[in-house]
Amino acid sequence: MNDKNIIVNKPEPKPGILERGDLFAIAVGMVIGSGMVTLIGPAMAYTGYSVWLAYLTAIVMGFFMVFPYIILGGTMRVAGGPYSIVTNLSGVSTGGLVAYTKLVTPILNSSFALALGLYLNNLLPGITVKALAIAGVVILFVLNLLGMDIFAKVSKILSTVLLITMVLYVVFGLTQIRQPIFNFSGDKMFTGGFKGFMLAALLLINSANGYYNVLWYGKDAKRATKDVPFAAMSCVPCLLFIYVGLAMVTGGVLPHDEVAGVETILPAAQEILPGIVYKLFMIGGPIMAIITTLNGVFNDVRYPIAQAAKDGWLPKGILKENRFGAPYLIYTYTLIVVLLPIIFDMSFVTITNIFQVITFFMNVTVVYAISRLPKKYPDTWKKNKFHLSSAGLYVFCTISIIIYTIIFIKGIFSIKLVYAVSAVIVMVALILIGVYLTRKGGIRIETSIWQPAEEEKNE
């Protein structure tokens, strides 16, 4: 085997067909998901009626946390995910970190499966939450094994139904608020002080920034460096209305003690909606949000792990596919990772905190790589759509890394010592494996990040 490591950037494709509206719909679908219907109650346990303000803070912090990605999207066409970014801008060894982190990120979907179990339990009270959660994941696993991605062709429709359902619920719910959620001196406001308020915001932040993933559609966008950033940033006002409004409704209809800590938004919904409308809302809103998010885990993990195997980070044997074209070994591994926290009775909060800890190293590595844009592509950087100087980029990247670091520290101190130590040990071990394989050689990486020459031809 050739002992040299090689990075090959694929040729830039011609501009795609996705326009601004298409990209916005994709971005909305990526961010409006199960987090909003599972974390408000637990966050309220930290901060009381000020949970709506904590969600607002989470949205603002989340924006600055992922803004470097959006800046990148306004400078380059990107299609290969974090793996392409770090290998193209920072080198081979960083690619190993991203590739291996993707092996453990499915753990977050355990919380989505638990959420599905909780909501289905309201329709099927005779079956336990754990059984419903496990059954839901296994059914989606089997459907994906059969090559039946049941949401692929209708994702835009489902996202539209979900968006309309949640907007209508928030608009109606805001007229039903009965609790003093705007009384800033009330005894149920800021119940945990500043610490509790920040714990709530940092718990909610992961559900409030997924729109940046539209960046990976740079290959398919017609005007990537213009429309991708626009689509991502246009999600922020939507989140401010839907998420903050939902937190107001969830925390403002019933007394504090009936809602704080509850892992669904159903107590308030059941209080203000008639029976049949309540059930329709539960299916069209929370359950749809959870299923579409949960189903996505298989493809979200499939492509990064498959690429890592092709490039030499993982055994190529895991690429085996069944007769339906599904990589059954990768899917089986993903299923196991998702099921383990459910089997061991971990809570939503614990799962979220573990996820934030294990993704810290990858996130900081990606942001650092983005900060190298002016050095790696000086001419393209001068044309960035935000008209930022290099110093401006460094400032935003520094702010992002600070926020990621705060979340990491919060995560470490918010979970059991054994979980914290295990998470850090796993990530350090994966980093060392990546360094070892880099030194050993034989890694051949294909990246998909381009200076937008083809796009500029059409302007």
Task: Name each model-derived stretch.
Residues 1-50, 62-63, 67, 79, ...:
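Membrane-interface "cap" regions at the ends of multi-pass membrane proteins
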Residues 4-8, 14, 47-52, 69-96, ...:
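Flexible loop linkers connecting adjacent transmembrane helices
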Residues 9-10, 15, 52, 128, ...:
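Helix-loop-helix junctions that connect adjacent transmembrane segments
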Residues 16-27, 91-104, 135-136, 191-202, ...:
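Select transmembrane alpha-helical segments in multipass membrane proteins
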Residues 42, 64-145, 150, 286-307, ...:
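Hydrophobic transmembrane alpha-helices that form the core helical bundles
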Residues 82-86, 91, 122, 233-295, ...:
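TM-loop-TM module centered on a large, flexible mid-protein loop between adjacent transmembrane helices
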Residues 119, 129-179, 191-193, 209, ...:
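Membrane-interface loop-to-helix entry segments
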Residues 317-326, 363-417, 445-457:
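C-terminal membrane-solvent junction of multi-pass transporters and transport-like membrane proteins
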